[in-house]
Amino acid sequence: AGTTHEPFSWEGKYFHFRYANPWPRPYQQPHPPVWITGTSPDNIPWVADRRYTLATFLTPWDVAEQLFNLYRARCRERGYPEPGPEKFAYLAMVYTGETDERAQEEGKKLLWYLHRRRPVEFFVPPGYVPPAARSRVYKAGPGPLRPRESWEELQAGGLVICGSPRTVLKRARELNERLGVGHFLMMNQAGFMTAQETR
């Protein structure tokens, strides 16, 4: 509907509209930028074919690198222009302290978010992943968001970036050089952190 410039009718499976005329029109044409989060290789061709931005959240760098490379390969395969960094986004949990030592101690509060348990239906709602993958997750039952990796493993994998301002900047540059992302999102609050610790 957002890309149609004239009134139209819609005869869908569940809804029927004899006359639809979206107004006001989106300012950005043909539509605002679309970001798709994904960690499944099955979704990458669909995202790349539409030239949407691919975002990975709390994903190890090696997995994100594989996904971004699949996107780039799909673009080459289809003859699309080489995707620039603006087509890739990455989110990590980031904690910056006055010193590396202090940041390492205070930043461990981020583990609450990474290790907390929650109902599986919130993690994999219907329509987000292929049915076969969803079935595997449901059969496994509720569990932590991620396996209980150690603090050091989470940092080595890139899910957590923690340290002094200089250390965090160095790791952010490493992330950019390795993954070629144009959007680096930082989650810097979780669980029991105080307001001061999140500033």
Where are these regions (language model features)?
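Glycine-rich, proline-tolerant flexible connector loops at the mouths of alpha/beta enzymes
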Residues: 58-61, 186-197
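An alpha-helical appendage that flanks or caps ligand/catalytic pockets
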Residues: 1-25, 62-181
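Glycine- and acidic
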Residues: 52-53, 153-158, 186-192
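Hydrophobic faces of well-ordered beta-strands that scaffold small-molecule active sites
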Residues: 34-37, 52-56, 86-93, 175, ...
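A local structural motif
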Residues: 26-33
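A conserved active-site cap/scaffold subdomain adjacent to cofactor or substrate pockets
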Residues: 39-63, 67-68, 72
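Short, well-ordered beta-to-alpha junction loops that form the rim of enzyme active sites
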Residues: 12-13, 39, 186-189
